[in-house]
């Protein structure tokens, strides 16, 4: 029930205790206090009846996103943080109670006109869906949690491709030789790019995983290293994984840990490594090659070495064969060679 108290300042204090809700607020007039208390009691009645609280008329999409961000246990990654800013910019002023398929249709129109592709727009809607789902289940608000997912599913009817194009590019031996020779001739090259690239080829690790490795994560006796917060579609944090360091990788790591004793194995900015790799490719006229393609080459080499799916998955961190398959690049002649070797 609601109680009202006249404060010495002349303002009115409303307090609502009902169905597990205990909230209070101060207002200039008793009428405002009563109106607020009535709305809060209505929410309590909805919750008590096993339903969800009605969305307050004044709450906007941006308000809900702000609450979602504040409730997060850790900071968002760069992509998610940028998407949340974009959502607040594009539809943030929309009243949450007015959010519907037409609003999202117009949002998609604007994104498409701005040059965003189907994959990007689908990701935008997936992030929005996560916010709506959180609002419904964490805040018990009567929100259409599947709204964004339904609009996402409709993108195909617009002719938008929502599946990212799978790359099958991997560097050739000749390309790698040219790139390494390019860095050898650079006296001002501060980042040991050849060493980092060879480590990527020997481990199949992502660029961010390489730059996060610390000496303390290495078990010299077991020749393993722990990758902290390894990428996982369900768990962004706490997904630590210990992986073996194969001979080529151990040959790189062993002198580093002996020399340093502590700290990062490769204390360089991820963006700087990527930029250096891109500049080298541009200078040499090597087209459509990215640092991440070294991971593709590594995964393919693991299979060519005769490792099975479980072993390669442990090295690369892929959870399923469907995720790993795009990196294999197994050729028909590889199958023939494997049979001959058997």
Q: Where are the predicted features?
A:
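Short, Arg/Lys-rich segments that mark the N-terminal edge of DNA/RNA- and chromatin-recognition modules
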Residues: 1-28, 66-67
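N-terminal core-binding DNA-recognition domain of tyrosine site-specific recombinases/integrases
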Residues: 23-28, 66-140, 165-168, 186-191, ...
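N-terminal helical hairpins
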Residues: 26-58, 62, 70, 74-77, ...
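Basic, Lys/Arg- and aromatic-enriched nucleic-acid-binding interface segment
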Residues: 118-126, 137, 141-207, 211, ...
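Active-site/catalytic core of tyrosine-dependent DNA strand-transfer enzymes
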Residues: 131, 174-176, 246-287
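Conserved tyrosine-mediated DNA breakage-rejoining catalytic core shared by Y-recombinases
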Residues: 148-153, 175, 208, 212-255
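Catalytic-site neighborhood detector that most strongly recognizes the C-terminal catalytic loop/helix
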Residues: 170, 229-233, 250, 271, ...
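C-terminal catalytic core of tyrosine-transesterase DNA break-rejoin enzymes
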Residues: 198, 202-209, 279, 283, ...
């Amino acid at each position: 029930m609601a109680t009202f108290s006249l404060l010495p300042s002349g303002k009115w204090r409303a307090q609502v205790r009902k169905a597990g809700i205990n909230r209070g607020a101060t207002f200039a007039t008793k009428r405002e206090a009563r109106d607020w208390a009535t709305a809060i009691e209505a929410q309590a009645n909805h919750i008590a009846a096993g339903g969800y609280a009605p969305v307050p008329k004044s709450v906007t999409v941006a308000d809900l996103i702000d609450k979602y961000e504040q409730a997060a246990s850790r900071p968002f990654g760069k992509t998610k943080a940028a998407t949340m800013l974009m959502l607040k910019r594009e539809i943030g002023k929309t009243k949450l109670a007015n959010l519907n398929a037409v609003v999202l249709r117009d949002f998609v129109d604007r994104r498409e006109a701005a040059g965003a592709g189907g994959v990007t727009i689908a990701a935008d809607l997936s992030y929005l869906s996560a916010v709506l789902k959180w609002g419904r289940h964490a805040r018990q608000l009567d929100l259409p949690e599947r709204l964004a997912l339904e609009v996402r599913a409709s993108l195909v009817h617009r002719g938008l491709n929502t599946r990212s194009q799978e790359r099958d590019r991997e560097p050739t031996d000749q390309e790698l030789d040219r790139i390494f020779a390019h860095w050898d001739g650079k006296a001002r090259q501060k980042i040991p790019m050849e060493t980092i690239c060879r480590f990527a080829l020997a481990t199949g690790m992502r660029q961010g995983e390489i730059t996060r490795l610390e000496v303390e994560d290495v078990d010299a006796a077991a020749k393993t290293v722990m990758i902290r917060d390894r990428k996982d579609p369900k768990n962004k944090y706490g997904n630590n994984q210990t992986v073996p360091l194969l001979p080529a990788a151990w040959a790189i790591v062993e002198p580093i840990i002996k020399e340093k004793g502590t700290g990062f194995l490769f204390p360089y900015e991820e963006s700087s490594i990527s930029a250096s790799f891109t500049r080298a490719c541009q200078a040499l006229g090597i087209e459509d090659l990215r640092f991440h393609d070294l991971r593709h080459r590594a995964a393919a080499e693991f299979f060519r070495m005769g490792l099975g799916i479980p072993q390669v998955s442990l090295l690369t961190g892929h959870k399923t064969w469907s995720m790993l398959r795009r990196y294999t690049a197994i050729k028909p002649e590889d199958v023939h060679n494997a049979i001959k070797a058997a």
